[in-house]
């Protein structure tokens, strides 16, 4: 049993050793020791017992076996008791070790708390140290400044000392130079004295020579020489005085001679003045003759001017009549000006509204800029937050580097001091340069002083030279006295000639000046006279033109007088024939005179209106040109605006995209920052936990190592230990291996966390790069936004200008259209009145040719309807009937709206055919002449009426088209009335506008014959003026049917004078109709162009408004 127990114990030990072999290095050492003991037991088995398998602890029990030769139960019990005691001791030790471990944990926690408090205290101390260092740095900076100031002061003192030394050195050098110069001067004086002794042969010093004299004795020698020179000068002065007396005598003689010469010259000047006066009198006589000629020319010019005034008075009388019309037009212009002023006030109000809109737009722009600024501020705040985060990280890194920074700070301070020293050296160099400049100035001053000293020396030399010159002057005086006597004679002769020449020159200059003044006066007079002659020539030309105009007017007046005389003869003949109508003839003459005056006045008004019309046409053309230019500019601006709007839209889209990207990036940044902070916190917590766990594990390892050492010591010391103790030891080893596994897991976690930290740093670097990129993109977006804001402001200003221009152009076009419509209405009225007056005039003429109307049956259809109408409308005045006639024709003519120009051309062709038929017409009798003239006149009158009605229709159409175009109507709606269907005969016949059916012709004829027989005294003029429209139209058709009969009968006789006048009036009417036709065509084209331009402008304005609405949306 015991052997089995030992075997089981050995197996357990082996199994435990196998289990524990998977542990660390200490467990392997323990197993190796146990295996060594087992091998020893197996080797010693043969000597002790014969059992094949020995127990495990046989080696360890060798010592008790040696002591106790025979093992027994007591021994085993003792051993078991000892092992139990050992186990109890081990359990007690384990409990103690656990208690110690818990105490160590508590102490560690307390130490951690203490360390945290110490860290806080250290931080407080660090802050205090930082404050102390700041104060020390400030104190050090103050000390540095003080040291620098002291260094500056020392440098300044050093510079001053150096300057003093340099000044003293320069003064010493100057004194040396002065000494040398004085020595040279003294040597020169000595040499001069030696030369003076040699020249004069006198000895200055009796005992010594001048070459051996001392410098101190030179003064006495010079004084002696000066005394001697003074004595000689006084002697020479005594000799010069008589020479001066002689010179004064010579001067007095020369003055007397000069006075004589001056008297002679004055006499000569007086002679020349007298001669000059004689010449001036001759010139004045010539000038007076020229003035007389000019006066005669002026008298002739006055006569011509009087004649011109008389003629001008005649013209002024004519102009007075015109001025009355001008006054009326001025009143109209004043009214128009008032209208314009009202419109200008309205435009000013619109400008005030536009300015208010501008201010609103500016406020919107400011708000937009503020919003953009707020966005920029938000971006800057985010960037500042990021910078703060980065600064916090950098501060955490800098906390470890502050000790190194202290050393670097000292080195930086040293570098700063070195830089300051370099700067000071630079300043010292600058001061040295200034010192050099001052030195150069001082040298210049010293040179000037030396030059002054040299000047003094030169003055001394001059004194010595003067002494030599005195002797030379003595000799020269003698020569001069001799030369003076010779030159006096030459001076006298030259003075005489000079005085003569000067007097002659003065006289000539005076004469030249006087002649030049007279020449300038004469030239000015000649210029004035030439100007007057040119003015007179211009007036003469004007008078000639006026005379030619007067002659033309006279010819016209003679022609008119001839016509009037012919008419008077006819009137006299007609008065003899028509005595009954004398009263009416007088009234008609008065009316005729009034009508002539009115015709002349209306002609003048028509001319003025034509002039105004031409001016307005020119203005309209200018406005059209401006409108075209403005349209081109508007098209360009609209295209540019559309392009810019597209660009603005694209940029806005890009900006929105970028803002969305920025927002997403901001959200990502916020999320990343939050995650980063969370990771930081987690990392800090985990790092603290890991530090705590590592510290705990280290303590546990230390305690376990100490326990293992204790167990090893106990196992070595103990013998015969039990398997239970081994199990306890193996349990301890298992706990140690488990704790080592925990330590490995924690190390792997630490590595994982370090890798996570590296990844986080990489992500942080990547986020920094993205942040820099985003900041750059934001800066570019901000610049582009500013550019776009500027471009938007420019576009808005351009749009406002275009709107203002469009409004101005619309107002101008409205004004032009209104003025054009008014002009057209005035022209229509004037033309209608002129046509009415011409009708009255022609019918008055034909009234005076009136007898014999009842004899011919061909006149019955003509006077059929008028005679019947005169019964009912005899009391109605002629003007009202003609007005109703014209208005009815105008209403009938309004039905033709398809092609008015075609009808006008056909009417002109008819008028030309009528004019070509007129010269061939010649009747044998006066009755037939009157019939043909009346028929032709009535045809022409009716054609003129139809043409005037068509013209009024055209004007109404143009006015309606203008108004419809300004109101924004379409091209198909220019005609304001519904089209009226025409008959086939109206479309085929060009003159069928006023033809009617001849169904009622026989009844009309019967009624006409009865009425004419019953009232033979009625005049056809009155009947025509009071006739209705239907009778006139029926008579036109009957007259035209009767034309070939008259043309076949009227080939024999010549044409009468009234027919000639009617032909002239028809030609004039034809010319006027052609001009009116061209005007109507031009006006139609202009109206169409203006309507198209206005529509295009309206379309463009609508497009611009739509674009603005889109932009606002």
From Swiss-Prot:
Pfam name, any one: CCDC158
Keyword Protein transport carried by entry: no
Listed Low complexity bias regions: 15-26
Key words, A-Z: Coiled coil
InterPro entries, alphabetized: CCDC158 (IPR031809)
Polar residues composition-biased segments: 1-14, 867-894, 955-974, 994-1017, 1024-1040, 1053-1062
Region (Disordered): 1-26, 848-902, 955-1062
Segments forming a coiled coil: 72-183, 243-833, 1061-1113
PANTHER family: COILED-COIL DOMAIN-CONTAINING PROTEIN 158
Name this protein carries in UniProt: Coiled-coil domain-containing protein 158
High-level lineage: Eukaryota, Metazoa, Chordata, Craniata, Vertebrata
